Design a protein with these regions (language model features):
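Juxtamembrane transmembrane-helix boundary motif
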Residues: 1-23, 30-51, 65-159, 168-180, ...
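N-terminal cofactor/phosphate-binding cores enriched in small/glycine residues
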Residues: 60
Length: 238
């Protein structure tokens, strides 16, 4: 990698980590477009560029989410009961999503990613729902939350995201105050990223990617981004 590429990855790590702490989104949405351009310029197989970018972005979230989760936990904002109820579905969904990605053409994934970002951006522009402090949250039961977790896991693996773009609006729409929704989403980031990354490694193991890659993961990009993302995630959380 050139010095310019390293600097850009470090900056993306700073931005992704800050957003992970601030919004509970994991930073993947910021990283994926840049990584696609980076891997394409580096001469990666065009058929696997998008998959490699998605997998690498998702792997960074494993580390970033731990840093962000710790900061939110210290503030007492994480709703751990919801995390445990969402986690089983998330783990299943991450495996399903990574397997879907392995069979989809890169161009289809790129278009789907752009549409998803546009849709979620429009939802964020509408603003958070105002929640009255005395009104209890209206959440589905155990099976309902497991189903929601599965959907979050699938979408996160498909789009290389930490799930915050889905988890935060869902929890907030059901009556969870925004700070607690963000903190809970940050805690869900680790099972999301772990399951999705594991799935990408299994599906990409025999793809013959270039040196510096482990299955679909580009290790050089991963370990350049991670230190800064972990450093800046607590900054966003506070």
């Amino acid at each position: 990698m050139t010095a310019t590429t390293v600097v850009m990855l470090l900056l993306m790590g700073c931005g992704g980590g800050f957003l992970a702490g601030l919004l509970g989104v994991g930073g993947g949405m910021v990283l994926v477009p840049f990584l696609v351009m980076l891997f394409d310029h580096a001469g990666h197989d065009p058929a696997m560029v998008v998959q490699t970018a998605l997998a690498t972005a998702l792997a960074t979230i494993m580390f970033t989410s731990l840093s962000s989760m710790r900061a939110h936990h210290r503030k007492g904002a994480v709703q751990w009961n919801l995390v445990w109820l969402l986690a089983p579905g998330i783990l299943v969904g991450g495996q399903l999503g990574s397997r879907i990605v392995a069979w989809l053409p890169g161009q289809v994934l790129a278009v789907a990613f752009a549409l998803f970002v546009g849709w979620m951006g429009s939802r964020m522009l509408r603003g958070a729902r105002r929640v009255e402090p005395d009104v209890p949250a209206r959440l589905p039961g155990r099976l309902g939350l497991a189903a929601v977790g599965t959907g979050i896991g699938v979408l996160s693996a498909l789009f290389g995201a930490g799930g915050g773009f889905v988890t935060v609006p869902f929890l907030n729409s059901r009556g969870v105050p925004l700070p607690k929704a963000i903190a809970t989403s940050a805690a869900c980031g680790f099972p999301i990223a772990f399951s999705g990354t594991l799935g990408y490694m299994v599906m990409g193991w025999w793809q013959g990617l270039p040196g510096g890659a482990l299955a679909y993961l580009d290790l050089r990009a991963l370990f350049t981004v991670v230190p800064m993302s972990m450093l800046f995630a607590p900054v966003g959380a506070y």
